[in-house]
């Protein structure tokens, strides 16, 4: 096994990545948007984080004779293109004593090896994100329970994926004992750990769950790495009410942990269901072959599934000509231009990704959130530049400058704006890249980027000018002394004559 990870696996991954290059690559803007969404949710419990996903069975070549390397490369490409949840259908081959992905010749452990390679390659502050693997067993496997009880399922998981990356039931219990778990109302002994702690403190990446068949396994297998079916709220599109039309409906849904919605969706409806608080599991196959007609379709599906805040072409610190002209027509107290600030663009007639780039010096109202209540909003009566958002008087008493951090919060904001009879409005939200270009962060206009050290140009000039002046003076002094010589050499012969004359007058011997 060690030899596989040290030699065979890296070579396979390299060949797989070469083959994966036929997939359409993400733009820089798409990468910034995905990272921005992750960072917005750092203090959200992991059970409330939207996890774009699909049924793996529907996305792989549907033949038992399909090329294994090609299928594993497809899985790796899906991971690299932002898929965070997989419904994995498993079947147990009694004669081989092995678990396989249903309908394929791919061993489950090989699929886990692929996930492990991806996790190792992306285990950085910039790229790390949570993954969920939801396991479902076919009917033949469920009927063959006696043979399965002899198999050590936990050993299969540990063979395929490093246990250090897996968030276990014991990890959850420990975090609850340490008061490190959250609900929508703050710390809770029945909640889940926040995304930031999950990724960067306890350094986990993967959550396993059973969708059925947990009773097939021994107690050791049940109580170790895989959470039981009752942990997850897994439903189909026919069993929900959407859209949510009141804050009460939103609060009711938010009490449900790990919400997954399985269905055959069109990309135009992804945001509609995301704002109902569900992680989507697509059952309709996404054609991953990148011929001239499929590449654009795949990109459209992925961007619509992954993004609920920014458009796929934002953020990029630039605006197109139409947006630029819109800003020039708006009122502004300054001639300066800085497209580094986030605004929410609300239109009652379109449920589009609402975040956009705005000129920080433009005058707009501010979005205000009530204390620590996730779903209560207000729009300030006063307008101002983004840099004035630090003014405590901008928001009503009890409110502070805010931003929607989940699709559910975004839906609650739309409900508030609709109740206020607002048809069309742009307003500032608490997200910007002022400190470092394309590092989109919250915390007001003076927040610093966690990924890059920053010093303002003004402060840099203030620090370097005195040093430069002193260095210049010292340089001039050096040049002066090199140019104007002190006449020590010229007087040496004269001194020698004086000393010789004095020596002649001296009396040799001891004076009497």
From Swiss-Prot:
Keywords: Glycoprotein, Membrane, Signal, Transmembrane, Transmembrane helix. Residues 1-20 form the signal peptide. Residues 482-512 are cytoplasmic. It is found in: Membrane. It comes from the Eukaryota. The chain crosses the membrane at residues 461-481. It is a single-pass type I membrane protein. Glycans are attached at residues 43, 67, 93, 139, 152, 179, 239, 264, 290, 311, 378. GO terms for cellular component: membrane. Residues 21-460 are extracellular. PANTHER family: MAINTENANCE OF TELOMERE CAPPING PROTEIN 6 (PTHR35518:SF2), MAINTENANCE OF TELOMOERE CAPPING (PTHR35518). Belongs to the MTC6 family. May be involved in telomere capping. This is Maintenance of telomere capping protein 6. It comes from Kluyveromyces lactis (strain ATCC 8585 / CBS 2359 / DSM 70799 / NBRC 1267 / NRRL Y-1140 / WM37). The gene is MTC6.
């Amino acid at each position: 096994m060690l030899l596989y990870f040290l030699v065979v696996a890296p070579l396979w991954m390299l060949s797989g990545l070469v083959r994966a290059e036929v997939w359409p690559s993400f733009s820089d803007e798409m990468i910034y948007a995905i990272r921005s969404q992750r960072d917005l949710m750092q203090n959200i419990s992991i059970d409330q984080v939207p996890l774009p996903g699909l049924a793996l069975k529907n996305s792989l070549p549907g033949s038992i004779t399909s090329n294994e390397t090609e299928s594993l490369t497809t899985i790796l490409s899906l991971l690299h293109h932002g898929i965070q949840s997989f419904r994995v259908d498993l079947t147990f081959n009694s004669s081989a004593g092995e678990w396989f992905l249903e309908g394929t010749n791919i061993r489950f452990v090989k699929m886990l090896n692929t996930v492990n390679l991806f996790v190792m390659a992306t285990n950085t502050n910039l790229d790390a994100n949570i993954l969920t693997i939801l396991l479902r067993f076919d009917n033949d496997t469920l009927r063959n329970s006696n043979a399965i009880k002899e198999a050590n399922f936990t050993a299969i998981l540990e063979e395929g994926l490093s246990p250090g990356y897996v968030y276990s039931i014991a990890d959850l219990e420990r975090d609850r004992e340490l008061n490190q778990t959250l609900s929508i109302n703050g710390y809770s002994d029945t909640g889940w750990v926040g995304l930031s702690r999950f990724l960067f403190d306890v350094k986990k990446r993967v959550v396993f769950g059973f969708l059925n068949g947990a009773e097939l396994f021994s107690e050791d297998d049940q109580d170790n790495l895989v959470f039981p079916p009752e942990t997850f709220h897994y439903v189909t599109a026919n069993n929900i009410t959407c859209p949510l039309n009141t804050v009460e409906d939103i609060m009711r849904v938010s009490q449900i942990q790990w919400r997954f919605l399985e269905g055959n969706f069109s990309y135009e409806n992804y945001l509609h269901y995301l704002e109902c608080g569900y992680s989507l599991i697509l059952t309709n196959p996404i054609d991953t072959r990148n011929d001239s007609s499929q590449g654009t379709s795949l990109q459209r599906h992925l961007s619509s599934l992954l993004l609920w805040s920014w458009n796929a072409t934002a953020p990029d610190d630039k605006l197109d000509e139409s947006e630029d002209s819109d800003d020039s027509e708006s009122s502004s107290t300054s001639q300066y231009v800085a497209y580094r600030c986030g605004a929410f663009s609300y239109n009652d007639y379109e449920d589009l990704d609402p975040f956009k780039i705005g000129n920080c010096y433009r005058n707009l109202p501010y979005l205000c959130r009530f204390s620590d209540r996730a779903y209560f909003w207000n729009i300030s009566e006063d307008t101002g530049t983004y840099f004035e958002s630090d003014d405590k008087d901008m928001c009503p008493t009890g409110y502070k400058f805010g931003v929607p951090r989940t699709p559910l919060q975004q839906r609650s904001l739309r409900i508030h704006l609709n109740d206020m009879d607002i048809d069309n409005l742009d307003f500032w939200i608490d997200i910007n890249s002022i400190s470092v270009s394309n590092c989109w962060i919250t915390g007001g206009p003076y927040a610093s980027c966690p990924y890059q050290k920053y010093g303002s140009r003004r402060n840099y000039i203030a620090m370097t000018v005195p040093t430069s002046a002193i260095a210049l003076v010292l340089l001039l002094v050096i040049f002066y002394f090199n140019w104007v010589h002190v006449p020590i050499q010229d007087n040496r012969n004269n001194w020698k004559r004086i000393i010789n004359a004095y020596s002649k007058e001296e009396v040799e011997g001891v004076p009497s």
